[in-house]
UniProtKB/Swiss-Prot annotation:
Feature: compositional bias, Basic residues: 577-586
SMART domains in the cross-refs: PH, RhoGAP
Pfam families membership: Lzipper-MIP1 (PF14389), PH (PF00169), RhoGAP (PF00620)
Quaternary organization: Interacts with ARAC11/ROP1.
Effect upon mutating R244L: Loss of function as activator
Disruption phenotype: Male gametophyte defect characterized by sterile pollen grains developing balloon-like tubes.
Underlying gene: REN1
Ranges for region Disordered: 1-64, 417-592, 719-825, 837-920
Protein name: Rho GTPase-activating protein REN1
Skewed-composition ranges (Basic and acidic residues): 475-491, 499-509, 520-532, 734-768, 776-788, 889-903
Top-level taxon of the source organism: Eukaryota
Amino acid sequence: MANKNAESSSQPPPHVQPNQQQQQQPPIANEQEQEPHGDTCSIPPAQSGNTDSRSRGGNTVFKSGPLSISSKGIGWTSWKKRWFILTRTSLVFFRSDPSAVQQKGSEVNLTLGGIDLNNSGSVVVKADKKLLTVLFPDGRDGRAFTLKADTMEDLHEWKAALENALTQAPSASHVMGQNGIFRNDHADPAVGVDEKKDETPTKSTVLGRPVLLALEDVDGAPSFLEKALRFVENHGVRIEGILRQAADVDDVEHRIREYEKGKNEFSPEEDAHIIADCLKYFLRELPSSPVPASCCNALLEACRTDRGNRVNAMRAAICESFPEPNRRLLQRILMMMQTVASNKTVNRMNTNAVAACMAPLLLRPLLAGDCEIENDFDVGGDGSMQLLQAAAAANHAQAIVITLLEEYESIFGEGSLSPGLYSDSEESGSGTEEGSDDEEYDDDDDGSQGSEDYTDEEEDLENESNGSYSESAASEDKYADSIDPDDHKINDNLSTESKSPKRSKEPKKLLSGSRRSSLPRHDDGKKDEDIVVKGVNNTEVKAVVEVSTSEDKNSSTSDVASDTQKPSKLSDAPGGSKRHWGRTPGKKNLSMESIDFSVEVDEDNADIERLESTKLELQSRITEEVKSNAVLQASLERRKKALYGRRQALEQDVGRLQEQLQQERDRKLALETGLNMSKGNQPIPETIDENLKKDLQEVAQAEADIAKLEHKVDDLENRLGHHDGKASGSTHSASKESRKLPEHNAKMKEKQKDTEAASTHISERSTSKDGQGAARENETEKQQDSRSKSSQQETSRGSSKLVGLSKRSGTKGEGSTTTTSALSKLTMRLNFLKERRSQIANELQNMDKGKTLGQPSPTSGQNRVSEETEKGSGSNQDPDSSKLQSPHILDRGRSENGGDRGRGSSGGNHPNTTPRTFSR
């Protein structure tokens, strides 16, 4: 009890409001009088009766300021800050400071609740948690209201102010009733009479129609209700808080009067909250309930069955007990509710919220107490029995509507219902309904105020079930406005019913069976086509009997009789201030223990709904993650395959390159071996290729040939020297020729240098020769060797002929000249072979440095072939050129000898010999 509070359990009592406005300090009172909405931000004038406790002059404001309130019992899961005003007789709270300027003209600052003070109360403070608890020993268990301050300073200030107010509060025995709250038995007829005297009651052409004409006019055109339903479906479903937030009563009445005057179409620019309240006002003013009492009993019995058979039982109940017009009207309203609930992400109205707003309008008899609800509440005689019955009835009504919404297709689908099954006996309604018709809507009746004992309770229950809704000030403050006092006719006549032995002995199982968590939930509502009302005239009347809230319970019957004489016009309500549906102050102080019975269901239900929504959200997230992971896995597999293939290709390349490197190393070794063969007899490695092996063998053969040629040259030189010695001793001219021989050798050396330069140029051009080109060169060299040998033989024969000729002519110098020519040829051949050897060495060095991996191009091969051809032709021309050079040299020698002889003949009378004789 210590942790409960008063926002819903203790509804703002009637006596708090008169005391609040008239007895506050002048500054606050003046600010409140400037508010544009009358009692929306202030307290209405004091009512007559109990003048000792409601005097206007002595009720001062001890303290006002913000405090936080919270209670698990009323569905709030966190502390909420409200503006409290403490007077001598009451502690009331508002959404915000009532003296502050309103931010929006459409928002109102109503009294959300309050408690009555008496001198029996006490204050308990928990400083560690900054909690402030007000205790009253009223009734059986007493009352306890817990508040929370922001700071320790505020905590102590509020404690002192509360203790001061309690000491000055009136005595509980003088001003309290059985429940410890002020009674408000009489209305104040003096207030607002001048404002209403000019208004003449007229019969409305829109309101008060029978159920048969609720959806369709006599001429078949859509009725006011049908147009309002379509407007909500088309334009109101995207408005936050539709059907929950209330519009001003005067605006609603003004729109209905405009409709009656000819403005019978709703434009999209109109306020959806006003049209929604017009819709609810129309249903409230129906002569009979949309669901008759007998049908409510049938639905109640069906709702008590287990979950598996509940839908079939409710379908059977509708088929057997519902009149056709009532069934069509119920279906049409449920379709609109489904449309609203299907847009819950936008309008923040889920199935529970829509059912909480519309169930009191659809199931009037159930909330009015005309249906039997099993209970075994034993709470004493303090009136808590009535409140528990009201809470149980509200829970059952909401559970029935939720089931109808969630199982709409199963209950009202194609083929589920047959018009022939309907009974016409229910259309006229019961006699009790007809007799109580005119008592349904009467603002002057005290029962309408007593009905608010459930109004604000349902507000907080709805706050709990709609935990995801915005907690903005406008939404929270306007929530209860959407519930009209007549939506929940929970009257004090329930006290007479509580005296019945039948009611007191009924089991308690119905309350636990009202848990909506046991109902199946399907948020996807489907719509049928619009329903056209057809059938016979319906003369049903309202079925709820209002009972006076007099302290004497036995006088309730006479109060009902007097109430039936009052007109059911909204304009007959006392006071000229604006009103909001569901905001007439209640007069019961519902204890926290009694609320726990009815609200515990909503707490569990909200928890289940939150868990289900969280589960669905997590499942959707898991599905998305699985899809993304599958895509990533596939990409990873493709990447692995690509890398594996790349790895294999690289391994193959590495193996091939290693083999090629080994081959090049072997070739290098073989070439080095070939270069070193001249130094010694080294074997050729077997690992080299055949072409290279042939090249090395040819080089070795060429070196052997060169060695032989050098040996022959040495022999020839020796012979030539020996022959020259003999020749010099025999003739003077031969000695002269021998003296000219060094000059001739010098010229021959110059020619050899030219030849070496040409050979060097040829070797540079042939650095890219392959094994095949080398083989061809070897063949050319062999040809050159054979030709050189033949030229040597010819030279020897020529020289021998020349020697014989010289002998015959007496000139010995010509033979020595021919020998010198042969020697020059051998020298040229030797130089060529040396150049070839240096060429091969250069090739080996280039191959070692460049790491050549491929075979030579065809172009290089062609170049080598052409170069070898040129060299071959050059070598073939060498013997001829030598032959040509030899006669030329001989001619020069003979000419010189002739000159000498000329000179000698001139000096010594020698005959002149023509050198041309031997040039041929």
